[in-house]
Amino acid sequence: MKNVVLETNLKGVKLLRRGKVRDIYEIEDYLLIVATDRVSAFDVVLPTGIPEKGKILTQISLFWFDKVKDIVENHLVSANADEFPEPLPAYKEILEGRSMLVKKAKPLPVECIVRGYLSGSGWKDYQKTGMICGIKLPEGLVESAKLPEPVFTPSTKAEQGHDINISFEETIQILGEETAQKVKELSLSIYKKAAQIAEKKGIIIADTKMEFGFYNGKLILIDELLTPDSSRFWSLENYRIGYPQDSYDKQIVRDYLLSIKWDKKPPAPQLPEDIVNKTAERYKEIFRILTS
């Protein structure tokens, strides 16, 4: 398939790890994060990539890093391959548009999730308990309802499998009171600002996941920010309370895999071309809407 980067191999550069989507290298005092076109579903990486997906994720992150830089510093050093240290400029053709040279921060062991609407695992929790992550919500809310106020619902990072939702009290035990309060405050501020920007463009940010780390003793924003892989974006025009919403993400892929009754165990099946093209179009569409 044209223009699909499933994996990078940068000779002479130390590969630290391959995540579900990103290849992470170490160079001098920095990390190089390369977003490939890999796509995962149900925690399994699929053999088929989505053209340009890595570039779109990177460009959306850069857009949001710039928009919230008044709230918190981030890990970006440069996204211009010509400015990367040697021998990286030689790989410009692969790296351009899909990579970031970043500060080597120490990641917090907690993922910071903010929910403004009731959806996904939050909706499931609410149906069972009337709460999300130990936060009591008003009675009688329906699926996709806007919450009275956005809520901070952290989770622990799982190396394998699903992340586990935790309460704020548990977050304090893991991070300490000061850091826990700070990431909560920063996460909510970022979400509120981004939600206002997106809404003006006809997009609802239902929920999103962010990551923070320490760099030289200072808390900074790391990883990706407000992308279709880390957030649920809905169309404001098509929003209907009480129902599941269409998201600008890989839902088309998940729906297809459910329809063929795949057992969710590796190896995953190949995706047909029409599913790949439709998914690529969803990613391109949200990029165009947000950055226009």
Swiss-Prot record:
The keyword RNA-binding does not apply. It catalyses: 5-amino-1-(5-phospho-D-ribosyl)imidazole-4-carboxylate + L-aspartate + ATP = (2S)-2-[5-amino-1-(5-phospho-beta-D-ribosyl)imidazole-4-carboxamido]succinate + ADP + phosphate + 2 H(+). CDD domains: SAICAR_synt_Sc. It is an enzyme of class 6 (ligase). Its EC number is 6.3.2.6. It comes from the Bacteria. One of its GO terms (molecular function) is phosphoribosylaminoimidazolesuccinocarboxamide synthase activity. InterPro entries: SAICAR_synt/ADE2_N, SAICAR_synth, SAICAR_synthetase_CS. Pathway: Purine metabolism; IMP biosynthesis via de novo pathway; 5-amino-1-(5-phospho-D-ribosyl)imidazole-4-carboxamide from 5-amino-1-(5-phospho-D-ribosyl)imidazole-4-carboxylate: step 1/2. One of its GO terms (biological process) is 'de novo' IMP biosynthetic process. It holds the Pfam family SAICAR_synt. Keywords: ATP-binding, Ligase, Nucleotide-binding, Purine biosynthesis. SUPFAM superfamilies: SAICAR synthase-like (SSF56104). The keyword Nucleotide-binding applies. HAMAP family: SAICAR_synth (MF_00137). Belongs to the SAICAR synthetase family. This is Phosphoribosylaminoimidazole-succinocarboxamide synthase.
